[in-house]
Amino acid sequence: MGCTSKSEGVAFVQAVLTKTGSVDAKNVIVDTSNYARHFEKWLKVFSRDQFLIVKEEEISRTPFKVIREAEEFLDVPGFFREDMFVFENDKKRYCFKSTRREINSSCPLMYPPSVPKPEISEEVVHKLRDFYRPHNRRFEELTGMNFSWSNL
């Protein structure tokens, strides 16, 4: 029997919750998404102006603008052009296209067909949101930015 949304959800919940049902802050999946904790470590080594924080929704809406901003931030010559991005209606997002043979057009699937999106109960989602909320607010303070997902 292959992976199903339900089996993936069960495996995810077993990984991120303790036996008592609380969020396991030490679990690698949970810890990886604690952006504030990781960013605070980086800020001990680098100044805030050495970071470019990019919102996923901006990449989705205006990929060329975001890439141009990254090129300027890195002080590298502009390589990308607006015509290198095409909106794919079936995927509902922009994809990279190239006329060069060695670079294949790229628009990966969000979830590959072989990996079903996990089915997670509202109770677990609520626990995770409650756990991350203070960390997400701290990340907003550290970055000086607002994120759509920080107050869910």
Regions from the PLM with identified roles:
Residues 1-152:
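Anion-recognition interface
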